[in-house]
Regions:
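Non-catalytic interaction-recognition regions
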Residues: 1-399
Length: 399
């Protein structure tokens, strides 16, 4: 959108020249150009900056007028739909979905209105802009409406939080962003606290670090050095084919999810595609294999062929004790909103089971029944934990 001249002017039919499978890349390239030209990088171009501001104003006007027919509007709506289509496809691929999207066209007007309603009591005028004086609360002062009368990201986030409250009347809203806007979000929530303290109290901000590939390459969405989520999946798939000589999308997806979730939220993530798909160490496939191994034992056993036993031997007791820790671990993960606790537990549980199985015969053993019951509880617990992480627990690791 920031480079309409490259389309030959405002001619929406020119968009047909962009192949369907290249739309996401094209949009990304245009985003990077616009971001760079606006001055988020050091080389700011004032003429381009003003042109982008005017484009932004025109986009707001499109929504105000419900314009779907003008050439500019057709370009805008088409590109926005391309973005939605891409993300819908990707979310389906990773097994998730969003119930509702909140585009800026919905959040910005509400944020603008809300901020204006509280000028004087919460927000103040300053050099033609509207700001929140965060310094009174040990924070910093930020602009919520700029001198052009447009809402900044701060006002849009006020609108987003307000809109979600109107739609869901939630008990808890968790906002997840990068670590670089911790102070920014403190200001936004502190401003809301002044006129809706209950809403601010029900909004929680969690942050994460940056993602780098092993070797130090940073994943970024605002510069030309871009590595998309789909690229991470493709890297894991290639590593899996080389390391395990198998193609299994379910296992690869679980490997990537686990590689991210096992890290405590808040820190940076060093992602190693080969390590993530390995059947050894703290990886998704290791845990999936430990589950498949247990299911294989249960499938081969003829339940009831051995006499019942009472009491537990030391190795059995150790595994049973670890299984029993599961509810407490889940409670802790939920209370802290930290899924890495579940990952750590599942890894330790799988290790415990593997040690147990290596040293204790199960089939055709006088303690077969009690050990099969123990393995059944273990497999169910492992599966439940993986399900909480949205990771599949296959009966067999390789198809």
């Amino acid at each position: 959108m920031g480079d309409i001249e490259n389309l030959g002017g405002e001619y929406p039919e020119k968009l047909k020249d962009v192949p369907e499978d290249e739309r996401a890349d094209w949009l990304t390239e245009e985003y990077v150009k616009g971001s760079y030209a606006y001055g988020e990088e050091e080389v700011a171009n004032e003429q381009a900056r003003q042109a982008i501001i005017e484009l932004n104003k025109r986009i707001y006007k499109i929504h105000e007028d419900n314009d779907h027919d003008s050439p500019f509007a057709q370009i805008y709506w088409t590109c926005r739909q391309w973005s939605y289509d891409y993300f819908d496809k990707f979310y389906a691929q990773i097994g998730t979905k969003f119930e509702k999207y909140y585009p800026e066209s919905e959040t910005a007007p509400l944020g603008l209105t809300t901020v204006r309603e509280h000028i004087g009591s919460v927000y103040q005028e300053s050099d033609g802009a509207i700001v929140f004086d965060g310094e009174k609360y040990g924070l910093h002062t930020r602009v919520f409406i700029n001198s052009n009368g447009l809402p900044t990201y701060e006002a849009k986030d006020v609108g987003l939080i307000m809109k979600k409250w109107q739609d869901y009347n939630f008990d808890l809203s968790v906002v997840i962003t990068g670590n670089d806007i911790i102070e920014y979000m403190k200001v936004v929530l502190k401003s809301i606290e002044q006129f809706m303290p209950e809403l601010a109290a029900r909004s929680r901000h969690l942050t994460h670090g940056i993602v780098k590939l092993a070797g130090g390459t940073k994943m970024s969405s605002r510069t030309g050095n871009i590595l998309r989520a789909i690229d991470v999946l493709e890297a894991a798939n290639e590593a899996n084919k080389k390391l395990n000589e198998q193609e299994n999308p379910e296992t690869v997806l679980g490997a990537v999810k686990y590689a991210f979730l096992k890290n405590r939220m808040g820190g940076d993530i060093i992602y190693d595609p080969v390590e993530s798909v390995s059947l050894e160490g703290n990886s998704g496939p290791y845990i999936q294999y430990a589950h498949a191994r247990a299911r294989s034992i249960l499938a081969k056993a003829s339940s009831g062929s051995q006499a019942s036993q009472t009491g537990l031997e030391p190795d059995e007791r150790s595994l049973a004790r670890k299984i029993g820790e599961y509810p407490e671990v889940v409670d802790k993960a939920v209370a802290e909103l930290m899924p890495h606790h579940i990952c750590t537990y599942l890894y330790e549980l799988a290790q415990n089971f593997n040690r147990f199985y290596e040293h204790n015969r199960v089939i055709d053993n006088e303690r077969q029944n009690i050990r099969l019951q123990l393995i059944q509880h273990y497999a169910n617990t492992l599966k439940n934990g993986l399900n909480l992480l949205s990771i599949a627990a296959p009966e067999r690791l390789w198809a």
